[in-house]
A protein has these predicted regions:
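N-terminal targeting or regulatory segments adjacent to alpha/beta-hydrolase or S9 domains
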Residues: 1-44
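Short beta-strand-to-loop junctions in surface cap/lid or active-site-entrance loops
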Residues: 17-19, 46, 56-67, 138-140
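Active-site glycine-rich loops that stabilize anionic/oxyanionic intermediates
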Residues: 20, 75-80, 153
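Non-catalytic cap/lid and distal C-terminal segments of serine-dependent acyl enzymes
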Residues: 55, 59-65, 83-89, 96, ...
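Short beta-strand element of the alpha/beta-hydrolase
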Residues: 67-76
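A fold-wide structural signal in alpha/beta-hydrolase
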Residues: 70, 96-108, 148
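Catalytic nucleophile-loop/oxyanion-hole region of alpha/beta-hydrolase
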Residues: 82-84, 90-91, 105-144
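Primarily recognizes the serine-hydrolase "nucleophile elbow" in alpha/beta-hydrolase
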Residues: 124, 128-176
């Protein structure tokens, strides 16, 4: 993953849930910069906690390389936050070199005192990210049948849970 160049276009940052402005969502988040050499000898990273408004950052491959495949990426972080760069954006850029889109999910982490929903927040966010990618497949030049999910550590648990708790949403609705 070292020495990867950015894709042709800047990544698109979207709120996972409608009615939220992606540019104002980070006001309550805590970002810890992790120096180069701590997790990876060549790359710095960031650990984001207190995520209240999840986002998905869409890294599309160069048009000439695009295969139509996409992967929703769930960074790890022990459900205390997300290692957004090393286990998120760096992986998305690597997927771009293979012709696949990388969609980095910055998901909410459980706060039992606040979460009264039937499904845990991270799972809701992952299911929504997959539905959104499928709903916007034509716009992003993706094949909706070639959208997968992967994760690292807690994000791996989240990815496997999302894969076994499939949620089609409302495919005929304007908002998936």
């Amino acid at each position: 993953l070292l020495g990867l160049s950015a894709s042709a276009a800047e990544p698109l940052v979207l709120p996972v849930w409608p009615g939220r402005d992606a540019g104002t969502l980070e006001s309550e988040e805590k970002v810890k910069d992790i120096p180069k050499g701590t997790l990876n000898k060549d790359l710095p990273s960031r650990f984001v906690s207190n995520v209240k408004w999840p986002t998905m950052t869409v890294h599309l491959p160069e048009p000439g390389k695009a295969s139509g495949a996409a992967v929703v990426i769930c960074p790890g972080g022990g459900y205390g936050g997300v290692a957004i760069d090393m286990e998120g954006h760096d992986i998305a850029r690597w997927l771009n070199t293979l012709g696949a889109a990388g969609i980095v999910l910055k998901y909410r982490v459980p706060r039992p005192a606040e979460s009264k929903d039937e499904l845990p927040w991270p799972l809701q966010d992952a299911q929504r990210a997959i539905r959104t990618a499928r709903a916007r497949a034509a716009e992003w030049k993706l094949d909706p049948k070639k959208i997968g999910i992967l994760g690292f550590s807690a994000g791996g648990h989240l990815a496997s849970t999302a894969a076994t708790h499939f949620d089609a949403g409302k495919p005929d609705a304007a908002d998936p």
